[in-house]
Swiss-Prot record:
Transmembrane parts of this sequence: none
Reactions it catalyzes: (2R)-2-phosphoglycerate = (2R)-3-phosphoglycerate
GO MF annotations in UniProt: manganese ion binding; phosphoglycerate mutase activity
Cofactor requirements of the protein: Mn(2+)
One Gene Ontology term, aspect cellular component: cytosol
Cofactor: binding details: Binds 2 manganese ions per subunit.
Example of a GO biological process term: glycolytic process
Annotated metabolic or biological route of this protein: Carbohydrate degradation; glycolysis; pyruvate from D-glyceraldehyde 3-phosphate: step 3/5
Name this polypeptide is given: 2,3-bisphosphoglycerate-independent phosphoglycerate mutase
Gene that produces this protein: gpmI
Annotated active site: 63 (phosphoserine intermediate)
Record-linked NCBIfam families: pgm_bpd_ind
Length: 505
């Protein structure tokens, strides 16, 4: 029996299952295609959080973690747990990259500028890491200025008024907060350089809103109607900006939302906006590798670990062709993260990236670029690829806005595109796995507070088999089981490094 062609992995980013949950966008939306698939096709559920995806117990999953595990076909120990352990056992403070950073600033007489997301969300960073780094650097006699990036997306929308007092109280002598900036500005990943420029100007030139303390900055932002994600870049107290001989240390451990602001800080020929005032840094340090290019500009505390024989690499070794597709908001996930942190495409791997719409927030255009993604999806099915991996960003990106009606529209847009792709797949004689990397839009109201819920969830996600072997069923599992399942459908052997198991029974 010949393998179906193409075999498709369709990831509905942020589409979880929560039958009892309030404000469940997928259930409330008009989604006839997904309704039909769940009623007529083999389906099961996947776990996307905690140790099943290489995270600490109870830690919610995210798109980086999800796509890394999906592509690896094994549980990958993620950076959050590795960093936590290093702080606990004391090896973080002794790390040669960190001690080298400290030594260079001692020699230059400069200040260490620490920047990172100031919440306990654990998706991009963690306040515990900020505090540990500040203690290590200030404890060595180097003055520390913290550029605190408020979250409001992976935690409650208005929780900085809780995080900031605790953070200020925990900072050691010799460390203070210099700026407070919403992640909307400091952690953009879709080339909204006007936003990044405002964060840059506050950090580098000490220009922006002003407040006497971080707590006052948050209170003023709330008075302006801003939630944590959108806090306007604010300069704290007498912070006067960066100077020659200073150092920069980015504490975020997830790459995609750190790249742009760090590019502005370090790229020699940066021209997305005028980087006037950028000092001659004595040292530049990153918690992790942010990209191959960034590795040329920053020393790294925790270098990336090679993941051998990912799904993409293994399919390429069989001489087969594959296609990766997502709009720009999720493009790194179906390429860089799915390929185990490798930037360069595999042999025979083609990619396409429609631009995400240029709107302030995606509730204003919940369809995002789903139609363009669907156009390319259908074309790829018709083009004869062996493997197609596509990500629909809408359920996650619109779910993060907390707008239920917009999230329902997002789900409907994705459902429509999925229907078009399935029609083309039936003609081609292919097979598809429909799933998600984590939950989000199925819980739009916080069941504990009754307020808006904008974060990811611990809910299971669906996994659906379309066009599989006759009589097949699916077993429940975890994200690491998806690559083995895809290889099963493609009639390919599973590399020994993949310890996941096919879900097909």
């Amino acid at each position: 029996m010949t393998a179906p062609k193409p075999v498709v992995l369709c990831i509905l980013d942020g589409w979880g299952l929560d039958p009892d949950g309030p404000a469940n966008a997928p259930l409330l939306a008009d989604t006839p295609v997904m309704d039909r698939l769940m009623a007529t096709c083999p389906n099961a559920t996947l776990t996307t959080f905690g140790p099943d995806v290489g995270l600490p117990s109870g830690q919610m999953g995210n798109s980086e973690v999800g796509h890394t595990n999906i592509g690896a076909g094994r549980v990958v120990a993620m950076d959050l747990g590795q960093i936590d352990l290093a702080i606990e056992d004391g090896s973080f403070a002794r790390n040669p990259a960190l001690t080298g950073f400290i030594d260079r600033l001692k020699s230059s007489g400069g200040t260490a500028h620490l920047m990172g997301v100031a919440s306990d969300g654990g998706v991009h960073g963690h306040t515990d890491h900020i505090i540990a780094a500040a203690k290590a650097v200030a404890g060595a006699g180097v003055p520390v200025v913290l550029h605190a990036i408020t979250d409001g997306r992976d935690v409650a929308p208005k929780s900085a008024d809780r995080f900031m007092p605790a953070l200020e109280a925990a900072l050691p002598e010799g460390a203070r907060i210099g700026t407070v900036i919403g992640r909307y500005y400091a952690m953009d990943r879709d080339n909204r350089w006007d936003r990044v420029a405002r964060a840059f100007v506050a950090m580098v030139r000490a220009q922006g809103e002003t407040a006497e303390s971080a707590q006052a900055a948050v209170a003023a932002a709330y008075g302006r109607g801003e939630t944590d994600e959108f806090i306007a870049p604010t300069v704290i107290g007498g912070y006067a900006g960066m100077r020659d001989g200073d150092g920069i240390f980015c504490l975020n451990f997830r790459a995609d939302r750190a790249r742009e602001i760090l590019r502005a800080m370090a790229q020699p020929d940066f021209d997305a906006f005028d980087p006037a005032g950028l000092p001659d840094f004595a040292a530049k340090l990153g918690m992790v590798s942010y990209s191959d290019e960034h590795d040329g500009w920053f020393d790294i505390v925790f270098p990336k670990r090679e993941i051998v024989n990912t799904l993409g690499a293994w399919v390429a070794k069989q001489g087969l062709r594959q296609f990766r597709l997502a709009e720009t908001e999720k493009y790194p996930h179906v390429t860089f993260f799915l390929n185990g942190g490798q930037e360069t495409p595999e042999t025979g791997e083609d990619r396409f990236m429609p631009d995400s719409p240029k709107v302030a927030t995606y509730d204003l255009q919940p369809e995002m670029s789903a139609e363009e993604v669907s156009d390319s999806f259908v074309a790829a099915i018709e083009a004869g690829y062996d493997l197609i991996v596509v990500n629909y960003a809408n359920p996650d990106m619109v779910g993060h806005t907390g707008d239920l009606e917009a999230a329902k529209a997002a789900c409907t847009a994705v459902d429509t595109g999925l229907g078009r792709a399935l029609a083309a797949l039936e003609v081609a004689g292919g097979a598809m796995i429909v799933t998600a990397d984590h939950g989000n839009c199925e819980t739009m109201i916080d069941p504990e507070t009754g307020g808006t819920h904008t974060a990811h969830t611990l809910n299971p996600v669906p996994v659906i088999l379309v066009g599989g072997p006759e009589g097949a069923t699916l077993a429940p599992g975890r994200l690491a089981d998806l690559a083995p399942t895809i290889l099963h459908l493609m009639h390919l052997p599973q590399p020994v490094e993949m310890t996941g198991r096919s879900l097909i029974r």
